């Protein structure tokens, strides 16, 4: 293909994403677009086609972004090449969304005709506007009995500033309005810029590991051309590789001769090491490199840390390999080795949020067959010590002694909640209970209010979202962003079993709630830890001070069962012997702690 043909082809390329709040019908719309452009044989069609992970189908959510090429015969007689990049909608996966958007020129904004605009919709719209994308608003599910398309149209105009006349009414499930959406994509989404003669610049927006072919990187070509046999250079590391295959996803991988300006496809270059193909890096040609890399993504820092330990210590190295492979296409995952007296060797792992953590844990157990114990998640605290030095703590067990600490800072987030009017009181009460600071409140219309609070991240990551949903009968939507670290009066609470500290059960809590939390946790542990042959005291302590205590009663064993009638001194002798045995057992006794006990730390509320 010569450059003239490449430029002509570029004019007919449209790169777009679909963005939406969870459950507004994004994956269904993607299915219909695939079906209507005849990209998938009818026999291969299944729901949520682009959600390739079993886990995604089971939970009905999109976790990983996916890119696919479609051909569309438009009414103007031209054939267009569409690259659809499917994105997740959950707040934990905002990073995946920002990666998808960096590879696009436009985005379809899907809004549920019954629910209207929700917090996550707005968050994704701002991301799209930051990337200077053209937006195509679609109101989905218009055939629902509760649908109010006219109200939602007005909302889109008032809150996002898009013209009502540009809104497409659709129902992905019933295949209504899909043809109109496809025509609008041609009209609204601009063709990509870029020069096929310039030095190659390709953005890696995703990558996965194949045991036979090495690393497969998903790329968007911004300038230049790449084909098999080219020697490429990674601009972040300077490492060079020879390209063995370039291709496109249709959704199956299909090798092609070359990828040129505006194309979205994949590249394989015998890259064996996960670290050599980092998401956000720029690929260029070794023989004619670009002068500067493309602007990558802002690195997402983990918000929540927890310890992952294999139940069988033999699996320690397998766990490392599993984490490395997952990290390849999940650049926000971080991990480092950690050891715990209670659990042996494992990894301290950083996640974007609780859903992200659950999913990584489930993927390790499913895809790699490693059984795990996870400790209670914790956020990152900054401690300024009395000697002026600073310490970062992501594991409560490593918190310095309170008398050495001058100040402790914890991360705060700005939380935006959209709530029906009737539940404003309940939501504000929940935020106050979670140490929130009221910022402002906006009445969006007669039905809904937008409430903004500043909250400590530690209170948000555990079960805030679940409680928000239950306090509003499931109607609230929620989004948060990190703002800053603020000074707080925090203490470390240790849990002692049989007089020994269990490092994996330590947690950090605000001093005002320490007593209630400690009391609630020891009572909870009493029910979760199985009874032993001896009595086990469970204590919660701050430093040297015990703030709560309870005992797990011993299992009774009747040593007198064989003693029929007979002498009282005989019975006494047996009882004394049992007592001595129990004392000895207690001195060396090891208490088995089930997985539920580690998670009990989370499930407490301050009530």
UniProtKB/Swiss-Prot annotation:
Gene name of the record: lepA
EC identifiers of the protein: 3.6.5.n1
GO biological process terms held by the UniProt record: positive regulation of translation
The protein's enzyme class: hydrolase
Membrane topology listed for this record: Peripheral membrane protein
Compartment(s) where it occurs, according to its Swiss-Prot or TrEMBL record: Cell membrane
Family to which this protein belongs: Belongs to the TRAFAC class translation factor GTPase superfamily. Classic translation factor GTPase family. LepA subfamily.
Organism: Staphylococcus aureus (strain JH9)
Residues at which GTP binds: 23-28, 140-143
Catalytic activity annotation: GTP + H2O = GDP + phosphate + H(+)
GO molecular function, one term: translation elongation factor activity
Function summary: Required for accurate and efficient protein synthesis under certain stress conditions. May act as a fidelity factor of the translation reaction, by catalyzing a one-codon backward translocation of tRNAs on improperly translocated ribosomes. Back-translocation proceeds from a post-translocation (POST) complex to a pre-translocation (PRE) complex, thus giving elongation factor G a second chance to translocate the tRNAs correctly. Binds to ribosomes in a GTP-dependent manner.
tr-type G domain ranges (all copies): 11-193
GO cellular component: plasma membrane
Assigned keywords, A-Z: Cell membrane, GTP-binding, Hydrolase, Membrane, Nucleotide-binding, Protein biosynthesis
Name of protein: Elongation factor 4
